[in-house]
UniProtKB/Swiss-Prot annotation:
Top-rank taxon, per record: Bacteria
Compartments where found: Cell inner membrane
Membrane association type: Multi-pass membrane protein
UniProt key word Lipoprotein: no
Originating gene: secY
Record GO terms (molecular function): protein transmembrane transporter activity; signal sequence binding
Provenance organism: Haemophilus influenzae (strain ATCC 51907 / DSM 11121 / KW20 / Rd)
Family: Belongs to the SecY/SEC61-alpha family.
Family annotation (HAMAP family): SecY
Protein known as: Protein translocase subunit SecY
Keyword Electron transport: no
Amino acid sequence: MAKQPGYQARSTNSGKGELKSRLLFVLGALIVYRIGSFIPVPGIDAAVLAQLVEQQKGTIIDMFNMFSGGALSRASILALGIMPYISASIVIQLLATVSPALAELKKEGAAGQRKISKYTRYATVVFATIQAVAISTGLPNMLSGLVPNVGFSFYFTSVVSLVTGTMFLMWLGEQITERGIGNGISILVFGGIVAGLPSAILQTIEQARQGQMHPLVLLLIAAIVFAVTYFVVFVERGQRRIRVEYAKRQQGRQILGGHSTHLPLKVNMANVMPAIFASSIILFPATLTQWFGQNDKFEWLNNLSMLLNPGQPLYLLVYAVAIIFFSFFYTAMQYNPRDTADNLKKSGAFIPGIRPGEQTSRYIDKVMTRLTLIGGLYVTFVCLVPYIMTSAWDVKFYFGGTSLLIVVVVIMDFIVQVQSHLMSSQYESALKKANLKGFGQ
């Protein structure tokens, strides 16, 4: 009995030790990611490429560079970022809704998920190869001196380097999910965006200092950033609580049940994924048209890429529709109203005024549909903020919308994950303490 306090302390410390190791792993992975973004692709003049990216400010290439954490402007092997993997994941998930074979794999549990993950990796290689070929063939035509020695050797090494970099990031993201905290892919996207924040802030302040931007405009931008951040936090914490009651039942001489609780449904159940998915889906064809369009034979692609530049009406329309679509798609992939209704029925719970079973499922689905529409419109509104700002004040993408939403939501999710790990370790410690007391008695 005297050993119980010491045992509890060791249990708590072991739980905190695991959390510490997971946090250190995430930090280490982000450091590796950052170091990798400085490893150059052979054959490209990085200084000339940085000049080119600066000239492309406000275009799809600028946005592509933002998501890669500036790796594109440094001609890094990680220039493609994690976007090819995200695009591949979207395609495989979409195919799973129409392909009976993939649909069956989803029902096979862990074994089926491993096969789907394998197909996603294969698709990632395909998407990364297509984008790498587009970049390697488009770069020599964009600026003189960018690629000093154009030839098969350059094309081969650049494509292999870029595809290898993407596959490494895919593996790193999976390791963060498994051995770290949170969703590894979201954290890598977050890391890429945050890496460019300091330079973007300093650049904007420098614009104001040199008189290119009125100080009041700078203050207004800061106020908008804080207002959007507050709005994002407010909505992300918002819930629609459905009242649930438990029927009274007799077990021996005891009356169990008879109490009520709530079924919480988030306003934005899809989280930040619609914004990431929509950006990935637009970036893939838009960058292809941008790179391939540098060839005189495909000049029409260059004209199309101009229409797909951020802030253009076509881009805004496609982006808004994609966000709404992926809000419904991702919510449907992650949450099943029928399963929730069945679980309530099995536990003896019901929604007042709604019959258990099919009617409960339809009611939850109706509520989720309304919430998803509200969540999709909210994400669309937040993501369109930067384009209004850039067109009015020539501010970089980092200051609003997609990037701000991703940063805030990933931080919030990360904090929740850390808290759940702490609560889990405390819960395990309490259980072990109770078991020791029972053993002592």
